[in-house]
Amino acid sequence: MSRVAKCPIVIPSGVNVQLDLQDISIKGKYGHLSRTIHQSVKIEFLNNQIIFSPRLGFSNGWAQAGTSRALVNSMIIGVSEKFSKKLQLSGVGYRVSITKDNIINMSLGYSHIITYHLPKGINAENLSPTEIIIQGIDKQLVGQIAANLRSYRTPEPYKGKGIRYSNEVVRIKEAKKK
């Protein structure tokens, strides 16, 4: 059994936390996030720490408390530091560019250019024609957008062409021999 919920979250300086029953809102240097916590979780705010514990009468209380603690911890990290995912394009003619109004244009070997509109709160930075960084305060949204962009051309196992995460290792298969 995981014991994530038993460890309290220490709130760093510059982060403001407000509790209202099951609603928690966090303000930091980079923005504001809010979330409703599951009803089986009791939240306490003591000595600049947030403590999660299960309420009586719920069978999944500890599981929900651990999940809630992890979600709130990622919210605190997001508003104070930001999350980022780096994507690399590998393949002949594969290019990426970003317009001023947060639209990503990708040339991925299709007959047309793929355009992707970034939602509010997410920024993209073009390091080179084949590298892009997705940044934002919401960890789930940053990861989902990076996965959506990667899904347009996932790395194939024979030559490794496609869009990959910067830390991803694509295992190359050997070609069929006669």
Swiss-Prot record:
Gene3D superfamilies: Ribosomal protein L6, alpha-beta domain (3.90.930.12). Keywords: Ribonucleoprotein, Ribosomal protein, RNA-binding, rRNA-binding. InterPro entries: Ribosomal_uL6-like, Ribosomal_uL6-like_a/b-dom_sf, Ribosomal_uL6_a/b-dom, Ribosomal_uL6_bac-type, Ribosomal_uL6_CS. It comes from the Bacteria. GO terms for cellular component: cytosolic large ribosomal subunit. One of its GO terms (biological process) is cytoplasmic translation. The keyword Coiled coil does not apply. Pfam families: Ribosomal_L6 (PF00347). One of its GO terms (molecular function) is structural constituent of ribosome. This protein binds to the 23S rRNA, and is important in its secondary structure. It is located near the subunit interface in the base of the L7/L12 stalk, and near the tRNA binding site of the peptidyltransferase center. Belongs to the universal ribosomal protein uL6 family. HAMAP family: Ribosomal_uL6_B (MF_01365_B). Part of the 50S ribosomal subunit. This is Large ribosomal subunit protein uL6.
